[in-house]
Amino acid sequence: MDGMKLSFPPESPPLSVIVALSLSASPVTIDSSAAATTVPSFVFSDGRKLNGATVLLRYVGRSAKKLPDFYGNNAFDSSQIDEWVDYASVFSSGSEFENACGRVDKYLESSTFLVGHSLSIADVAIWSALAGTGQRWESLRKSKKYQSLVRWFNSILDEYSEVLNKVLATYVKKGSGKPVAAPKSKDSQQAVKGDGQDKGKPEVDLPEAEIGKVKLRFAPEPSGYLHIGHAKAALLNKYFAERYQGEVIVRFDDTNPAKESNEFVDNLVKDIGTLGIKYEKVTYTSDYFPELMDMAEKLMREGKAYVDDTPREQMQKERMDGIDSKCRNHSVEENLKLWKEMIAGSERGLQCCVRGKFNMQDPNKAMRDPVYYRCNPMSHHRIGDKYKIYPTYDFACPFVDSLEGITHALRSSEYHDRNAQYFKVLEDMGLRQVQLYEFSRLNLVFTLLSKRKLLWFVQTGLVDGWDDPRFPTVQGIVRRGLKIEALIQFILEQGASKNLNLMEWDKLWSINKRIIDPVCPRHTAVVAERRVLFTLTDGPDEPFVRMIPKHKKFEGAGEKATTFTKSIWLEEADASAISVGEEVTLMDWGNAIVKEITKDEEGRVTALSGVLNLQGSVKTTKLKLTWLPDTNELVNLTLTEFDYLITKKKLEDDDEVADFVNPNTKKETLALGDSNMRNLKCGDVIQLERKGYFRCDVPFVKSSKPIVLFSIPDGRAAK
């Protein structure tokens, strides 16, 4: 494609062609100054031309070197792609728009991509057609009307966010209902919505936000692993940064050496990466300790802060009762003298703290002289023993936000009463104000999000660690089998809502099921205990192997080798449900008729005998049974199910977690699995037929060591 130029009129850019060129990193010069009556065209260096958006799109599909399957890898796929490329034009017809959405939505219920198993120009054509309608699609996208279509659209946007957001910002005018080329003047390039009053602003979202000027921060304290509540804050920052073409920085709020460690820092960075968050840089509040100390001293000199040696319990009581501290009117000299004692970490200094001088009678108790600095002689995980004093979150956070150029600080609504304090601190410091934007904290039933309480479970040995699959940490839920795509969709569906409802887990697991079910391989397992041998008297004298799909609707899952033998294993529960003379269906084989049932003295089934009836109709049988061949190639499995760690839907602040510990949170069942499961890798997600979805936690090592599979909830039960 070297030396090629894309030419089109400024009022009608071929969005699908531009997207395809951008995704495939194809070298091309863009000229958006063609006459209004012309069609998009490729002009080659030798003077040859191709005309028309669909022709150009197909050319990109065929010639994209970095995406070899962009136009399919066989004639059938390429023909299907042609169908979708032609169909994309329907979305530009106002009367047919929703009918088209409905058709594609239904098709995507069982497909990840429109054609084949990877992104193609079929996806590009439909995706661009939707994106190009602007506000009409955005409104539907926020609704729950076309969930499969929205999932597909969002997954493509998430996967190629940097490229696609750039294209959308340049060529899609929100609210206009059609693509337009970006205006050439610098000022007008910021006008995304298109009317003069809303220049630089997308749809109502962050207050006073301008395209390209938004700077956000995600500021976790390194005192634990990232959990699902933190993930909501992190992903909302990511979402707004992408929406406004801004940036996110990660800042570790490392102001409490008693709780923090490098282990937590390392794992937080790992988890942020798992969430797919791209950040400009990593900073630490401790980077600003010298400046924070200077600011505290400045406020004392200006009479806006003082040193207080009131005992902590008395100080809390005075704050509740609105009583001024006896130290409130200390002279500047006395405050600075005690401040030096605090810096030195002396015995006298350890009795003191620094407080802001606000209003002790303010109805909002957060405004009653908040603490700015405390002594803490413990070693800091990053800077060692350099400091004996540390700023509080309430003092350090607004200072560093302003200093780092943060335009909008996202905070959960639990901080609402401290918003006025945040603004007052910045006012007293004489620093630039920062916009605060609230969202509701994520509350889930039977779930602890307090790092202190989670740490208690770790320290008592009730869980295996911070990545325990019963934990709500990112590492824990991923280990349980949750796909990050599901978590992102779940959180963004809630948006920045301030609703504080207690949520069930089943919605999240239902989203996860929609993602894994269309693609995960199918395997077979039989519970080992009391399994029953079913002898087929006319079965094969010699075992034979047949290759069958691991997923009947998804070729990409591959094939598995299934062995057929004269005797097969059934689970006791299945064997006990069969009557003599009953015809049953053996899945992936055919029908069989049970002729004889053997039971022990307690009435338990111990053996079955019967004959094959492969011509029998599977529609007429009541029982469709999973089975395994009687061979020594089967693998040992440990199937692990989990329950909630606590027995109360929501713990109150004064509840002791030890009083509500669930004593039975883990159930292990030994089973046998088909031989193909030897190839499972840690993290693979599969479906065991008639049992559910599982994630491989420990893969096959040797015959004596079972493969460990973790059960993945599917949304039907809140587990």
UniProtKB/Swiss-Prot annotation:
Keyword Cytoplasm part of the UniProt annotation: yes
Residues binding L-glutamate: R217, F218, A219, Y393, D394, F395, A396, C397, R411
Annotated compartments: Cytoplasm, Cytosol
Pfam families: GST_C, tRNA-synt_1c, tRNA-synt_1c_C, tRNA-synt_1c_C2
UniProt motif 'HIGH' region: location: 220-230
Residue numbers spanned by region Disordered: 176-205
Signal peptide: none
Catalysed reactions listed for this entry: tRNA(Glu) + L-glutamate + ATP = L-glutamyl-tRNA(Glu) + AMP + diphosphate
A cellular component term, taken from the record's GO annotations: plastid
Ranges spanned by the short sequence motif 'KMSKS' region, renumbered to the chain: 448-452
Biased composition range(s): Basic and acidic residues: 195-204
Residues that, per the record, bind ATP: S93, H227, E414, L448, L449, S450, K451, R452
GO biological process, one term: post-embryonic development
Gene3D superfamilies, sorted: 1.20.1050.130, HUPs, Ribosomal Protein L25, Chain P
Assigned EC number: 6.1.1.17
Keywords: Aminoacyl-tRNA synthetase, ATP-binding, Cytoplasm, Ligase, Nucleotide-binding, Protein biosynthesis
Family: Belongs to the class-I aminoacyl-tRNA synthetase family. Glutamate--tRNA ligase type 2 subfamily.
Record's subunit section: Interacts with GLN2, COL4 and RPP13L4/ZAR1.
Its biological purpose: Catalyzes the attachment of glutamate to tRNA(Glu) in a two-step reaction: glutamate is first activated by ATP to form Glu-AMP and then transferred to the acceptor end of tRNA(Glu).
Name of the molecule in the record: Glutamate--tRNA ligase, cytoplasmic
